[in-house]
Amino acid sequence: MADSDKHGDEGPSTGVVVKAKPKTKKPSMYKVLMLNDDYTPMEFVVHVLERFFNKNREEATRIMLHVHRRGVGVCGVFTYEVAETKVTQVMDFARQHQHPLQCTLEKD
């Protein structure tokens, strides 16, 4: 046998081409927070939670009571765009009904 055959250094090389998968970063998440006030009726807050956050009556009532007792509560966690939209929707809806209800967002 020739030396080149022993070492396998000569001739065409074969290999596998591996495509690098791009690393996709998960989007940052934001909490939509509802703030307590002394003027917005509890039933209105429950309605907002059901309408804009798809909460059932029991869960909406639980969140409303948490906001009432602690001053602030989480309505949900969303991507920035969704959280921002929900805050705007809630604030606009509250103003239309002449309630001072406040919502804000905070990075999770």
Swiss-Prot record:
GO terms for biological process: protein catabolic process; proteolysis. Residues 1-10 have a biased composition (Basic and acidic residues). Pfam families: ClpS (PF02617). Residues 1-21 are annotated as: Disordered. HAMAP family: ClpS. Belongs to the ClpS family. Binds to the N-terminal domain of the chaperone ClpA. Involved in the modulation of the specificity of the ClpAP-mediated ATP-dependent protein degradation. PANTHER family: ATP-DEPENDENT CLP PROTEASE ADAPTER PROTEIN CLPS (PTHR33473:SF19), ATP-DEPENDENT CLP PROTEASE ADAPTER PROTEIN CLPS1, CHLOROPLASTIC (PTHR33473). This is ATP-dependent Clp protease adapter protein ClpS.
